[in-house]
Each structure stands twice: as C-alpha cells, then as structure tokens.
UniProtKB/Swiss-Prot annotation:
Binding site for isopentenyl diphosphate: 43, 81, 131, 226, 228, 271
Family: Belongs to the IspH family.
One Gene Ontology term of the molecular function aspect: metal ion binding
Presence of the UniProt keyword ATP-binding in the record: no
InterPro entries assigned: LytB/IspH
Pathway: Isoprenoid biosynthesis; dimethylallyl diphosphate biosynthesis; dimethylallyl diphosphate from (2E)-4-hydroxy-3-methylbutenyl diphosphate: step 1/1; Isoprenoid biosynthesis; isopentenyl diphosphate biosynthesis via DXP pathway; isopentenyl diphosphate from 1-deoxy-D-xylulose 5-phosphate: step 6/6
Catalytic activity, EC: 1.17.7.4
Catalysed transformations (reactions): isopentenyl diphosphate + 2 oxidized [2Fe-2S]-[ferredoxin] + H2O = (2E)-4-hydroxy-3-methylbut-2-enyl diphosphate + 2 reduced [2Fe-2S]-[ferredoxin] + 2 H(+); dimethylallyl diphosphate + 2 oxidized [2Fe-2S]-[ferredoxin] + H2O = (2E)-4-hydroxy-3-methylbut-2-enyl diphosphate + 2 reduced [2Fe-2S]-[ferredoxin] + 2 H(+)
Keywords from the named record: 4Fe-4S, Iron, Iron-sulfur, Isoprene biosynthesis, Metal-binding, Oxidoreductase
Protein name per the record: 4-hydroxy-3-methylbut-2-enyl diphosphate reductase
Species of the source: Bacillus mycoides (strain KBAB4)
Binding site for dimethylallyl diphosphate: 43, 81, 131, 226, 228, 271
Length: 316
C-alpha cells in the first residue's frame, strides 16, 4: 500500500501558541490555583487529556458563560476560539485571573465586527451553530450579528439596513463559504464581503483538494469536535472525489476501509498532535492484508509526548 502524506497538515501556529500559553501557565507557580481552561483549548481530546496531567482542568459545556458559572476562584484560560466581551467581564467580576489564548486570526474578526458596528453595519456571520468560535464572534455585538450556517437560514433573515458586512468562522470549508456568500449577494446586493478563512485552514484544504485525488481513500486524523478536521474529510469527498474517514487516532481505523485500497492519503487537522498522525502513518505503512500480525491498531503515544515543549524558567 502506498501512503500519500498530504502536506501541509497538522498543527497551525494559533494552536501551537495556545498550547504553549497553557503550558507556561501550568509552570507558573505565581498563578492562582486551580487553573481552568474554559472549554477545550483546542478541539482535540488527546491534548486536553495531556493538560489534565499537567494539572490544568478542562471544563466544557453549552456556552462559555455557563462554564464560567462553575468557577469560583483560580485562573481561567480562554481558548484559541475566542470569547465574547460578556465572558471577559463576568470573569473580571468574579475576581478570576484570566489568560487569553485566542488565535490572532479570530481576534482580527472580532476587531472587524466591532469596527463595523461603530459604522452602523449589521454583520452576517457564516459559521457552525453550537461551535465556540461563532459563539464568541456573535457575542461581540449580539444585537447586530446574524449567524447563518446554510442557505436555508437566509430565507427568514431580514436586516433593517443596506449597510451589511459578511464574514465567517475561520475554519469553514472555503468552498462552502464561497457558495453561501454568492447566495447572500443575491438577497443582499449591497453587502460587503470579508472572507476570513485562516491561511492555515485554506492551505490544508487546498492540499487535500489537489493531492487526495490520486488516492483510493483519505484518512483525516482529527478529533470529532474539530471543525477543520471534519471539513478536510468533506473536501476530500466533495472536491477531490476521494472517499474519506476521520479518525481520532490509529485505534479508530476500520480494516474494511482498506480492502482493495492501493493508495491511501493521510492528512490531519490543525489541532491534531503530530505523534498521533505519525502513528497512523506508521500503521498504514506496515499494514499487510494477508498478515494478521500487522492488523493491531492500538494507540501507544504517551500523553507526555502530546504537548509542545516549553523552556522552564530558572529561578533567580
């Protein structure tokens, strides 16, 4: 079996920065304990499990405000997905120490929404409902930001002004966003468009679109909650025309997927630890359908290998 290692794949700078911020927090003895992450720091359970070993508690729930209600003291880390001003204010009122690990690309969208609100605009925001990134973006100005996920959402959308900005969640499929923007332009011809697919998401999607078409199968390594990982599988199927499966790690690979497959493409979401992806590639590389000894799919990567290394500051 030939392995097509799609490149680029895996970690983006926003994810690495967020994890380094959280690791440094764990090492900072001056920070009030306990230390919480408000939601998953990035959408990967291997990462959150590794942070648990570092002594950082991940709390998840329907909304950031609801999670915050569970915390009475200590330090709170805001995830790469960003949070609303209301969440920041609530944390301040509760006397919590806060650390902001928001991805710079997400912050740029928040700043854009604030600027356009000041100019009297309404904002149509394309994103996934119940995902933390749209929650934070809508929370910047909930009175003028309208979240839509699909074309059907446009049917009932009414906006009381011609001053309309259209932007989007950074991890969406760029093709889905383009199609929705075309639909929006038909209904709201005066709308201004500001596509905010982050560069890391864009180049990873384009790599799948261009490189997966030579494969019989694509394996996307990523957490089920990772929107960008799920979009990579979608791009493989809809753009490259190659059947795709998303797996959290090697243990989720089904042998029947590999029957008759000569070329398998492998990519990974922006929040997927590199050792987890390497383990998937190593399994596929040694897999022999005629040799049961090669069929074991057991994740062996230790949690201490998941997180990026940080330099420990020497005490003066």
């Amino acid at each position: 079996m030939k392995i097509v290692k799609i490149s680029p794949r895996g970690y983006c700078y926003g994810v690495v920065d967020a994890m380094v911020i959280a690791r440094n927090a764990a090492l900072d003895k001056s920070l009030p304990r306990p230390i919480y992450i408000l939601g998953m720091i990035v959408h990967n359970k291997h990462v959150t499990d590794a942070f648990e070993e570092d002594g950082i508690i991940t709390l998840d729930g329907p909304s950031r405000l609801e999670i915050l209600d569970k915390i009475d003291s200590g330090t709170v880390i805001f995830t790469a997905h960003g949070v609303s001003p209301e969440v920041k204010q609530r944390a301040k009122e509760k006397g919590l120490t806060t650390i902001d690990a928001t991805c710079p690309d997400v912050t740029k969208t928040h700043d854009l929404i604030e600027a356009k609100k000041a100019e009297g605009y309404h904002v149509i925001y394309i994103g996934k409902k119940n995902h933390p990134e749209p929650e934070g973006a809508v929370g910047i100005a909930p009175d003028i930001v309208h979240l839509i996920e699909k074309a059907d959402d446009l049917k009932t959308l009414e906006i009381p002004t011609d001053k309309i900005l259209v932007t989007n969640q950074t991890t969406m499929s760029q093709w889905d966003v383009q199609h929705l923007m075309e639909d929006i332009q038909k209904k709201f011809p005066t709308a201004e468009f500001h596509k905010e697919i982050c560069l890391a998401t864009q180049v990873r999607q384009e790599a799948v679109a261009k490189q997966a078409d030579v494969a019989d199968l694509t394996i996307v390594v990523g957490d089920p909650k990772s929107n960008n990982s799920n979009r990579l599988a979608q791009v493989s199927q809809e753009i490259a025309g190659t059947t795709a499966y998303r797996v959290a790690d090697v243990s989720e690979i089904q042998l029947e997927w590999l029957q008759g497959v000569e070329n398998v493409a492998v990519t990974a979401g922006a929040s997927t630890p590199t050792p987890i992806t390497k383990e998937v590639i190593a399994f596929l590389d040694q897999y022999d359908p005629m040799n049961p000894a090669t069929w074991d799919r057991i994740r062996k990567v230790p949690l201490q290998k998941i997180l990026p290394r940080v330099k420990v500051k020497k005490e003066q």
